[in-house]
């Protein structure tokens, strides 16, 4: 009998261990609620960590928000990155293009009217390892942009295993600031592996071309009144610019005419401008006021100079650090540190690489895909002067700069001039008025129109409603039939298109629910194994009595189950009624504390947190 119980315990333990070690499925990532929001009924979201490097415990955190409306023939998926390096893409999710804004110190959540998930799936990724909710062994942080490309290719491979319905989407990479380095490197890698069908890139206020961008700091600062144009200021800044030029020439000589991402001597230009802005704005012996280098229309206390901006950033930080959010977004227990906007240690390790600047990758990428550069005109740190100069000097698709005669045209949204725009040979550029380093933070709805124009949504809306692209024709009342889960009437004039849409929707739904059912099916098998073993042991214990009644092994198993039920006072019942798999797939576990903020690397730049660091 002891042997039988040992066998039972061993087999049961083996079955349960196999269940525990089963790879994660979609159901493990399903987001059932958002702290501070009354309901998520209008959202379909998944989030959590994906293991991409088992050797170093490398896990990347993602937050996928599915499109509210399907309006294009093929679904669109936007992958968003923030910069730094080492700054979390939760900035993008909660300050810019995501579905929510944290609006007050009570951590109340409001919808974002300019959210990019209206007509496209949006996938926010904290990368590289150590950024935001992502993590790895601390001695395994990445040291180069080529490694970032490999990391993201591995992530996308694992992501598509979890979400196979996304495998045939049109993919776009988007981001801002130092993502101007990330995105071209990631795009180049994904083109080589063809892991996804990459259609285009969107880079906002990007850091891509050191030479042309460093040289435009002084002209921008003087033209926009960041500092007064005095003889002394011009003299001081010319000295800094001359030092930068010498450093650039030396760097080119060492690297066959190419420049790295950062040149330390050139960073002093920016530091000098901010220092001068402090001197002009501050009373003698005062703490000091300086320009906000992310939005020159604002000021900040020295030495923050922009790091206290945006104004709602403290609410976002508190919301992301609270246990309720950590649990709701399915962050792994292995993530020990609290969320922080930017990890200085990640940035410090990334700066150890000696990668060529991403500008050298742009011509090849422009041969095969469209690229949109957009800039807010109030940003100093990655200002529009620098990016416009980059385009003028860039050679792509057979020519240098814009085709002769092309100039920036007025960009009108809903009858209002929102900036300047031009497109030529797969390259589109938009300068947005009254916008900062984080353009969608200031102009969310205009940026949504910009996105829709670029990825083909505006044309689809125009075909549907008869309005012109860019005229704000996104009227939800016109789109009831395209909304996720809805079905058109049989007499609709576009029934053929609807059939295709319903077919795509069915494929996606089948794939998602297949993943959900796998978890329940595995659990059922484990339960049946345990019940079978219990019945077998009961039969062994009572086999003398069973043989007298000529009862079979199968009969004794069911007899044992029946007696077990009766001993509890009656048959077992399903008190919950019909099981709602979407609501009960993930029961909340114990809250856990992510711990204290990781100490920032001592070598990390104090002045700059979302820009290229040196």
Swiss-Prot record:
It catalyses: Preferential release of a C-terminal arginine or lysine residue. GO terms for cellular component: membrane; trans-Golgi network. Keywords: Apoptosis, Carboxypeptidase, Glycoprotein, Golgi apparatus, Hydrolase, Membrane, Protease, Signal, Transmembrane, Transmembrane helix. Residues 480-491 have a biased composition (Basic and acidic residues). InterPro entries: AB_hydrolase_fold, Peptidase_S10, Ser_caboxypep_his_AS, Ser_caboxypep_ser_AS. The keyword Transmembrane helix applies. GO terms for biological process: apoptotic process; proteolysis. Glycans are attached at residues 42, 426, 434. It is found in: Golgi apparatus, trans-Golgi network membrane. Its EC number is 3.4.16.6. Residues 18-518 are lumenal. Residues 465-503 are annotated as: Disordered. It is a single-pass type I membrane protein. Its main location: Golgi. Residues 492-501 have a biased composition (Acidic residues). Residues 540-614 are cytoplasmic. GO terms for molecular function: serine-type carboxypeptidase activity. This is Pheromone-processing carboxypeptidase KEX1.
């Amino acid at each position: 009998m002891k042997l039988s119980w040992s066998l039972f315990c061993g087999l049961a333990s083996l079955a349960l261990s196999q269940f525990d070690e089963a790879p994660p499925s979609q159901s493990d990532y399903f987001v059932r609620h958002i702290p501070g929001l009354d309901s998520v009924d209008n959202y379909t979201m998944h989030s959590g960590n994906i293991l991409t490097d088992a050797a170093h415990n490398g896990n990347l955190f993602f937050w996928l928000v599915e499109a509210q409306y399907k309006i294009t023939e093929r679904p669109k998926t936007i992958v968003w990155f923030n910069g730094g390096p080492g700054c979390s893409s939760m900035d993008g999710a909660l300050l810019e293009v995501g579905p929510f804004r944290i609006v007050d110190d009570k951590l109340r959540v409001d919808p974002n009217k300019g959210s990019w998930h209206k007509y496209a799936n949006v996938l926010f990724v904290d990368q590289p390892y150590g950024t935001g909710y992502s993590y790895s062994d601390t001695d395994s942080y990445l040291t180069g942009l080529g490694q970032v490309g490999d990391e993201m290719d591995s992530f996308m491979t694992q992501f598509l295993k979890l979400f196979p319905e996304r495998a045939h989407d049109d993919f776009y990479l988007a981001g801002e600031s130092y993502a101007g380095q990330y995105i071209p490197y990631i795009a180049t890698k994904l083109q080589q592996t063809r892991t996804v069908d990459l259609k285009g890139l969107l880079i906002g206020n990007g850091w891509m071309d050191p030479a042309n961008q460093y040289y435009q700091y002084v002209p921008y600062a003087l033209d926009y009144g960041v500092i007064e144009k005095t003889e002394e200021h011009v003299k001081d800044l010319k000295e800094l610019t001359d030092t930068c030029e010498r450093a650039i020439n030396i760097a080119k000589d060492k690297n066959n005419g190419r420049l790295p991402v950062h040149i330390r001597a050139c960073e002093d230009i920016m530091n000098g401008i901010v220092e001068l802005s402090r001197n002009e704005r501050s009373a003698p012996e005062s703490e000091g006021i300086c320009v906000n280098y992310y939005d020159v229309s604002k000021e900040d206390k020295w030495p923050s100079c922009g790091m206290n901006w945006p104004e709602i950033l403290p609410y976002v930080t508190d919301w992301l650090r609270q246990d309720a959010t950590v649990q709701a977004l399915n962050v792994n227990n292995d993530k020990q540190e609290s969320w922080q906007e930017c990890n200085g240690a990640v940035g410090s390790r990334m700066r150890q690489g000696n990668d060529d600047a991403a500008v050298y990758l742009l011509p090849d990428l422009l041969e095969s895909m469209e690229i949109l550069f957009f800039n807010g005109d109030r940003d100093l740190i990655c200002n529009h002067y620098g990016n416009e100069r980059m385009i003028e000097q860039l050679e792509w698709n057979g020519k240098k700069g814009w085709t002769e005669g092309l100039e920036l045209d007025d960009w009108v949204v809903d009858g209002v001039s929102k900036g300047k725009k031009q497109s030529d040979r797969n390259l589109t550029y938009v300068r947005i008025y009254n916008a900062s380093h984080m353009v969608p933070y200031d102009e969310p709805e205009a940026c949504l129109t910009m996105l829709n124009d670029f990825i083909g949504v505006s044309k689809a809306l125009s075909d549907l409603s008869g309005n012109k692209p860019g005229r704000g024709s996104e009227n939800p009342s016109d789109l009831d039939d395209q909304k996720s889960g809805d079905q058109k009437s049989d007499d609709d004039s576009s029934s053929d298109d609807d059939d295709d849409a319903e077919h795509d929707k069915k494929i996606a739904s089948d794939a998602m629910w297949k993943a959900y059912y796998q978890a329940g099916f595995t659990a059922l098998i484990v339960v049946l194994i345990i019940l079978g073993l219990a019945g077998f042991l009961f039969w062994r214990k009572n086999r003398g009595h069973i043989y007298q009644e000529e009862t079979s092994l199968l009969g004794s198993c069911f007899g044992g189950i029946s007696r077990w039920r009766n001993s509890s006072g009656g048959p077992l019942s399903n008190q919950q009624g019909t099981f709602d798999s979407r609501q009960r797939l993930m029961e909340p576990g114990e809250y856990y504390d992510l711990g204290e903020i990781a100490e920032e690397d001592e070598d990390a730049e104090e002045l700059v947190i979302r820009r290229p660091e040196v």
